[in-house]
């Protein structure tokens, strides 16, 4: 059974999440308490978020300047296929081989594929936040960031993968043996191509990750049923039609199978404090699966119109927008658009791909590329990940 959660969207009005909660109607207040059916027995989890400064990840350029050189580059040759990839690895200060450390595996989008192994470090926040002084002071950990010579999967012409996807599982195993990794605390995350790869591996190998953070990607939902037993948070921007529709498909699968999850709509303009407040409310759902959509119009579109970055020889791919008739669940209250407000009061999720009329593929790609870093500034979510 699904768990319902309502969060007010008031960042665009300059109001705090707390003040916003004070203006809710009685109906919204009732749903914001994570209403459950009789069959839902999960209680709210106790979290210890707030240990790490929630504003440290705001400046991407500063992260790149400070930490992109903190990684070593190592070649891995796969015995099964003979293929070679270069991975970036960060070892915590005072690394001791006799100890065991949690490990984050971050996989970038396809714009980072190519000959420059460090491209996956400098494209955005996703790799470097985990190696920052602020994060490592509270969570000493190993960070693994592979870079592939080519795009490793295709979601445009059906769903297909190259040998590099399965190679990634063997790479993680190899690194876990080579370094002092606590194999019960491996955390998977990635954006776009990296999100899709992490979705696939989490589904195929249920014991691989302790928890996952999926960021703006999608995959064939018929292959993802094992996610129902996984612990994760899944981010997608509503203006990124492919990723958002893919996320909705997973929620619909959970609905059909009676699996609990918590969903909330967030505002991309929220401050670090507002994001932390929203995270606390989200986690009060007490489920293992969390879904967050960035409200339409709250993500600033990127100037990028292609997945082919400076390190990429081929484009990433996206499915055309999919119309879904999935069962509607509770969503946070209104944005500026009255139609969204009416849908919220009715307990509906926003329709995929509707955002502000930006339904062209080019505009969707711009929002897609821009949305990655929004997830990796949610420090409280990162802290929750490491509690698993």
What are the language-model segments listed below?
Residues 1-4:
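Positively charged n-region of N-terminal signal peptides that target proteins for export
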Residues 21-22, 30-33, 39-101, 189, ...:
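A domain-start/cap signature at the N-terminus of enzymes
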Residues 94-95, 99, 153-192:
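Gly/Ser-rich "nucleophile elbow"/oxyanion-hole loop immediately N-terminal to the catalytic nucleophile
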Residues 177-178, 184-228:
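Primarily recognizes the serine-hydrolase "nucleophile elbow" in alpha/beta-hydrolase
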Residues 235, 240-244, 260-388:
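C-terminal catalytic histidine-bearing segment of alpha/beta-hydrolase fold enzymes
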Residues 16-19:
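C-terminal motif of bacterial Sec signal peptides marking the signal peptidase cleavage site
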Residues 24-48, 326-344:
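Low-complexity, Pro/Thr/Ser/Glu-rich flexible segments characteristic
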């Amino acid at each position: 059974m699904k768990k319902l959660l309502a969060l007010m969207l008031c960042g665009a009005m300059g109001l705090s999440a707390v003040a916003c909660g004070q203006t809710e109607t009685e109906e919204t207040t009732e749903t914001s308490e994570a209403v459950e059916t009789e069959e839902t027995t999960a209680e709210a989890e106790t979290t210890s978020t707030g240990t790490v400064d929630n504003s440290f990840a705001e400046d991407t350029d500063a992260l790149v300047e400070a930490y992109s050189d903190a990684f070593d580059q190592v070649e891995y040759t796969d015995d099964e296929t003979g293929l070679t990839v270069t991975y970036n690895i960060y070892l915590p200060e005072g690394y001791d081989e006799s100890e065991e450390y949690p490990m984050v595996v971050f996989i970038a989008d396809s714009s980072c594929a190519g000959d420059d192994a460090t491209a996956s470090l400098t494209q955005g926040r996703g790799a470097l936040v985990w190696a920052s002084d602020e994060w490592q002071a509270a969570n000493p950990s190993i960070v693994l960031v592979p870079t592939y010579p080519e795009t490793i999967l295709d979601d445009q012409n059906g769903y297909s993968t190259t040998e590099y996807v399965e190679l990634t599982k063997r790479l993680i195993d190899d690194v876990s043996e080579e370094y002092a990794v606590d194999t019960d605390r491996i955390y998977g995350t990635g954006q776009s191509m990296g999100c899709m790869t992490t979705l696939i591996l989490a589904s195929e190998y249920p014991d691989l990750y302790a928890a996952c953070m999926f960021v703006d990607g999608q995959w064939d939902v018929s292959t993802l049923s094992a996610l129902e037993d996984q612990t994760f948070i899944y981010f997608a921007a509503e203006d990124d039609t492919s990723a958002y529709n893919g996320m909705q498909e997973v929620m619909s699968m959970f609905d059909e199978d009676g699996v609990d999850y918590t969903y909330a709509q967030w505002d991309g303009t929220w401050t670090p404090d507002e994001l932390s407040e929203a995270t606390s409310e989200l986690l009060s759902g007490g489920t293992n699966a969390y879904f967050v959509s960035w409200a339409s119009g709250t993500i600033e579109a990127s100037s990028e119109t292609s997945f082919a970055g400076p390190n990429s020889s081929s484009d990433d791919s996206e499915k055309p927008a999919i119309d879904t008739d999935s069962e509607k669940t509770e969503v946070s209250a209104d944005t500026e658009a009255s139609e969204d407000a009416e849908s919220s009061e009715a307990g509906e999720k926003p329709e995929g791909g509707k955002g502000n009329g930006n339904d062209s593929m080019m505009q969707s790609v711009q929002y897609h590329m821009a949305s990655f870093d929004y997830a990796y500034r949610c420090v409280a979510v990162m802290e929750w990940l490491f509690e698993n």
